[in-house]
Amino acid sequence: MKVNKYKVLATLVRSFFDAFSSGIIDSTVGDKADTPANRHTPKMVKQMMLDHYEHIAPVFMDTMFFPLAAMNYEYADIERVVREAQQRGDDMMALVRTACGTDAMYEGMVTEYKRNFGNLLSGRMTSNADHLEAYTRGNDAEAVLSAERAVELTVRVVMFAYARGLRQNAKGKVQLRQATLFRLMLDAMNVLLNDEAVSVDDADASDLGSLFLKVCHTQQMFTTMTDEMDRTYDELVRREGVEQ
């Protein structure tokens, strides 16, 4: 199975903003608000964006560079890309532009960044259906990525962005809130692997396996996701101050 790179790109950008903002909100409200609707009121989302406005772009670029590069280059070539950028004296923004591979992909990334940023500034978290209708589509039908790699990169963005959002208000190690992480991952897989948003309203919320299989469709995609979640969690423990 292949996924168009522009769809992957849009998923990565949306997932970053959803996860980063959720991390900030979780670190602010703790367990005082127990549902996503209560935790993501328009007023709360707007205030979060205003309080952390200057931090969003640097964290975005740091979080997104590797997934963007891995989407457009072979893993073996990424080190060369970084080395050449350092020799040119590129700043992080230029490095991210290089990671996009083409001007069209970079422009698509900027458009998605502005769209998601603007939605949050207005206090809105876009629904899966709205995202799938509005995301930036490129003209290159041949620009595709294996679904397995797309899932792996999406998992990485969700978990790193969420952890880095949690750390914005933290003084020590942070703990991932499972309910938030699973909600973020479910939404991310929904928009990545489907052309129309899959409703999970009729699914048993206590049966996570069934919920994820409904949006992932196959055991292979579900296993790819869970394996990458385990690997990324270990990396977060080592590098990002996440409690084990």
Q: What residues fall within each predicted segment?
A:
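Extended non-catalytic scaffold regions that mediate assembly and binding
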Residues: M1-E54, V59-M61, F65-V157, Y162-Q244
